[in-house]
Amino acid sequence: MLKGATLIAGPTASGKSALALQMARERDGVIVNADSMQVYSVLHLLTARPGPEELAMAPHRLYGHVPPSKPYSTGRWISDVRELIEAEALARRAVIFVGGTGLYFRALTEGLSPMPEIPEAVRIRWRKRLAEEGGEALHRLLGEADPLAASRIRPSDSQRIVRALEVVEASGRPISYWQGQASHPLVDMTSCRKIVLMPDRNTLASRIEKRFDQMLRHGAVEEVKQLLALDLPPSMPAMKAIGVREISAVLAGEISLDEAGSRAIAATRQYAKRQITWFRHQLGPDWEHMPV
């Protein structure tokens, strides 16, 4: 178990990475990514991963280490964090977890039940069926295979529906069985500091707009070209990064770059709003809610 860690959560563009870097430089620390999109190798600009200058200032872990062709889950992230701890890659350093994926922080502080390995063929088959049949049809199938899971998952939540169906097929047991297994946190709750940044709405909106404009100027279009060249299914998580769909439409001649920017900025604002709502309701009073 990791002692004395710092956890920094917050919505996109709230200044999390800058705060983490400041702390790491002051305390000879190492920064560990807790953002589900910043794990992907091709998506550097669109996910606002730290650049070369930031990477040179402090050690960074679990950034850009996953090919976008590979699915990546909360369970995989926890496994990667556990490997870092067991390999003593974080030993004798101030460890700072930073990101906007609330489920990662929940798993880190509350534990995550073990899940079975899902064969790649099973993943491909269910993602193909999702693309062909749609989420509502698969939700009906889940109602037959795992009624309890179906009652807990909205018909519109296609990612969780597919995950539950994959688990049933791969293990022969419903996902609720695995979720009921014992789990343990990876950080010592008595010695860690937990911070969630809560930015002013107008300030955040301005930051989001400015940041996406910078992404476009620095090569986001070329980044999307590289991603599209991989010919990935639209259901892959990396393909759902904000900006990918919008810039893809530009490359297809469907909309202008200005229109793509407007749409991506609006989508980012909506995403930040959902993040803030989640943090307010899911992160308890033991978290420092820090205005920025």
From Swiss-Prot:
Q: Which GO terms describe its molecular function?
A: ATP binding; tRNA dimethylallyltransferase activity
The catalysed reaction is: adenosine(37) in tRNA + dimethylallyl diphosphate = N(6)-dimethylallyladenosine(37) in tRNA + diphosphate
User: Which regions span the lipid bilayer?
Assistant: none
UniProt protein name: tRNA dimethylallyltransferase
Q: Which organism is it from?
A: Chelativorans sp. (strain BNC1)
Family as reported in the entry's similarity comment = Belongs to the IPP transferase family.
User: Which EC numbers does the record give?
Assistant: 2.5.1.75
UniProt xrefs under InterPro entries: Dimethylallyltransferase, IPT, P-loop_NTPase
